[in-house]
Amino acid sequence: MNLTLQESFDHFLLHLQNTGDNTAETLAQHEQVFQWLSEYLIYYSDLFQAEGEETPSNLQVWEESLDNFIEQLIQGEYDSPPSLEGLPFDRIDGDYLRDFLAWHLLREPSVNSLMVQHATETLLSWLDHAKNQLWLDKDTLQHWQDVIQDTLPDAKRAAIAAHLLLYHIRLGGGVAPRLRGKRFETFKEGHARVAQVSESELWLTFDNAPKSMIGPVVLPKTILQHLRVGDVIDVELGKREGVWMIVDIGPVYPAVVYVPAEEMALPDKVM
């Protein structure tokens, strides 16, 4: 197959432009999804990994290395950034689409659950178009559709959890009046894995100390109902007077794209 991935994006967008009642705003939303997907595939997947490059074994170091690479790229320290122009369409598979929806997309600060839903619909429409153009066989289409549809509920749930946690922190994080203004005794930050969840509390672990649980962290039930054991939270925790609380929060990633560090065989990534 000589078709490139970029050509499949362009062909699909042109098809939408020439058919149906798609508005300029709708077309721009579809195009944005492909821009995000392109960023993930180029900078965060293993599709453009140079031979001989090694991947850090620690997941947090790995993500920090990726972010550093992006910063260097933005500053023009790389002469020839990779492109999807030469990437064959058949180089990707359902795993890339799953990791895009449940990891990379959730890193975007502006993304909410509705946008995750929209991105999913864009990908499914693109795959249907690819099948109609005979770029995909029936079995491959079905497998990719299953992967996307199985990923969607967890990706939306994680997006909701992240936004609720952010609002919770902005509103004071449920800190008791007697504790406000008092210094924290210690801090812990990084990618924390949800180890236990109850109706009012959760316990977290970090990959560098998987047997040491931190908690309980008291949270409203409306937040906890969107968290599952195995989810990973980019978080900063503070402890004062023996009470752990969330000080700062980043994305929440569903367990579907994270496994314990000791069980993970990290793919090579662009560094």
Regions found by a protein language model. Give the residues of each.
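Extreme N-terminal targeting and regulatory segments of eukaryotic proteins
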Residues: 1-5
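Surface-exposed beta-loop interaction hotspot
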Residues: 144-181
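Structural detector for short beta-strands of small beta-barrel domains
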Residues: 172-200
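Short nucleic-acid-contacting surface segments enriched for D/E, G, S/T with interspersed K/R
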Residues: 189, 219-236
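Hydrophobic beta-strand residues in large extracellular and virion-surface proteins
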Residues: 194, 204, 233-235, 246
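OB-fold (S1/OB) nucleic-acid-binding surfaces
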Residues: 195-217
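OB-fold/S1-family single-stranded nucleic acid-binding modules
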Residues: 238-271
